Curated annotation (Swiss-Prot):
It is a single-pass type I membrane protein. It is found in: Endoplasmic reticulum membrane. It comes from the Eukaryota. This is Maintenance of mitochondrial morphology protein 1. Residues 65-516 are cytoplasmic.
Length: 516
């Protein structure tokens, strides 16, 4: 029994019909998904927070963000962005270097100016002004305007300078209101009663009221454009600025009579009184520099204005008031000397650059015309008369300063000279003998002025001559000159000192005065 049991344990029994197959493990089955570290609620909160942050950043940096600053015009930025070329100072590469001991010829002392120095594009590039488009469209038959891409500039500083100039003119005109030859009233009366222009049926025109106004023109929106000009290389530059003058009392009132000379002279007389006031003026002012020799046949010759006559009279008022019999035509002589100088410069072939200014045709000039016609039965503010006067004023203005007509003014010589050197009235000489400049003696309106001259013969005028006559700041010299018994020169335009004149500087010891 024991032997059979052990044999059965050692040898297992398998039925013949049963087969054992090996177990195969399939490794391609998907693994169970990993559990997320955040729950659905936490993910929703994180997503909403990120969206809020993106919206806040967009609002802060794109909507409420500051605009980028404009490109600086400082020296450091210019040096890095716009490098300058010093071709004039650089040595020439195609010619041998000149020795220091070599004496150059007279024609080679002044270094040549590049031909592109007056070119419009070269000037705009060197001044960092963008006024020319990249691809301009051609236009034939008339000058082409290149609209400026530069930002319009404010003219606040220019308004202040113009206001000071106009205020000085108004004050000078008021100071000279009683002068028989130098006042604006005399100039206007002479202009209105010119026998060559006044019709025969109009009697003598009498100016009854003049108002130079109290307000000042306001300039704004200045821009520089390039204009094609066949007479200049690369065209020419033109400055456009808007000007506006309103709410001012600029007016002129006159009285005259209409004469009926048929069938006999002065058969009937009709009194007429007119008052013209400028209500508002606005337009676009064009300013450009015109070379004289190239545009002499295209530009208009400057016409003398009352301001020119007044300025000439201011310069010569001392000589006119002291000796009217000796020099009755002082302003005319001064104007003749100026014209002779201009003719001399043109004869010598010296190019003289002029300033040309005009207004565009889209200007606005509003006038107020008041009229009174008749002696007994008077007609007041006749509409037809106002229409005729406005049309005449508009025609006068357009014939002079509206495109294509321009006013040409020659630029003065601003080269510093000792004959034109002065001292402000608020300053005094620190020492008695420190001044080497010859200062003229300013006299009272009843005597002639001594002309100071550095050889040129031009008389020097005092600073701020419109404030208190002509002796502001020079009273010490005048009185000391009178105390020394100096003899004043009666020929103020000769430029030299005549007689035994004695001058003393302020602060010096007085000389011995001989009593007679």
């Amino acid at each position: 029994m024991a032997g059979s049991t052990s044999a059965s344990l050692q040898t297992p029994y398998f039925p013949s019909s049963t087969q054992i197959n090996p177990v195969r493990v399939d490794h391609t089955l998907p693994l169970p998904p990993a559990q997320p570290s955040l729950s659905f609620t936490q993910g929703l909160l994180v997503g909403q927070l990120s969206v809020v942050l993106l919206i806040g950043a967009f609002i802060k940096f794109f909507i409420f963000g500051e605009a980028p600053p404009p490109p600086s015009r400082g020296l450091s930025n210019r040096t890095s962005t716009h490098p300058r070329s010093y071709s004039i100072n650089a040595a020439s590469t195609d010619s041998s270097p000149r020795l220091l001991r070599e004496k150059p010829s007279t024609s080679n002392i002044l270094r040549p100016v590049p031909s592109s120095s007056t070119n419009t594009r070269s000037i705009l590039r060197k001044t960092y002004y963008s006024a020319t488009p990249t691809h301009p469209t051609p236009k034939h038959g008339r000058p082409r305007l290149y609209h400026s891409s530069h930002q319009p500039e404010s003219l606040d500083w220019f308004n202040v300078l113009i206001a000071q100039t106009i205020a000085q003119y108004r004050q000078t005109a008021y100071i000279l209101k009683d002068s028989p030859t130098s006042s604006i009233l005399a100039s206007l009366s002479e202009t209105l009663n010119n026998p060559e222009k006044k019709p025969s049926f109009i009697d003598i025109i009498k100016v009854t009221d003049i108002s130079l106004g109290e307000e000042f023109p306001i300039f704004s929106n200045c821009r520089v454009i390039a204009v094609e000009d066949p007479n200049s290389d690369g065209g020419r530059l033109q400055a456009l600025m808007d000007v506006d003058l309103s709410d001012d009392n600029l007016s002129l009132a006159i009285e005259t009579s209409l004469l009926l000379n048929y069938p006999k002279p002065f058969s009937a007389v009709l009194p007429v009184a007119l008052a013209v006031s400028v209500v508002r003026f606005s337009g676009t002012l064009c300013i450009s520099f015109v070379p004289g020799p190239r545009t002499s046949d295209q530009t208009m010759s400057p016409i003398p204005t009352p301001h020119d006559t007044t300025s000439e009279a201011i310069d010569d008022q001392s000589s006119d008031q002291s000796s009217p019999a000796q020099n009755p035509d002082g302003p005319k002589d001064a104007h003749a000397n100026t014209s002779n100088t201009t003719d001399a410069s043109s004869k010598h072939g010296i190019p003289k650059t002029s300033l040309a200014f005009s207004f565009l045709p889209d200007y606005r000039l509003d006038l107020s015309v008041r009229s009174l016609i008749g002696s007994r039965s008077r007609l007041q503010d006749v509409p037809k008369v106002a229409q005729l006067v406005e049309a005449r004023v508009q025609s006068w203005f357009e014939e002079r300063v509206v495109e294509p007509r321009v006013q040409v003014v020659g630029l003065p010589n601003i080269w510093p000279r000792m004959g034109r050197t002065g001292l402000r009235s608020s300053q005094e000489e620190p020492e008695a003998g420190s001044g080497s400049v010859e200062i003229p003696v300013m006299t009272s309106p009843g005597t002639d002025g001594v002309s100071g001259g550095g050889g040129g013969g031009g008389s020097m005028r005092g600073i701020d001559r419109g404030l208190s006559g002509r002796e502001v700041g020079y009273e010490a010299l005048r009185f000391r000159h009178a105390a020394c018994g100096g003899h004043q020169n009666q020929s103020g335009r000769d430029g030299g000192r005549g007689g035994n004149e004695q001058f003393a500087m302020p602060g010096s010891m007085p000389d011995t005065v001989t009593e007679t």
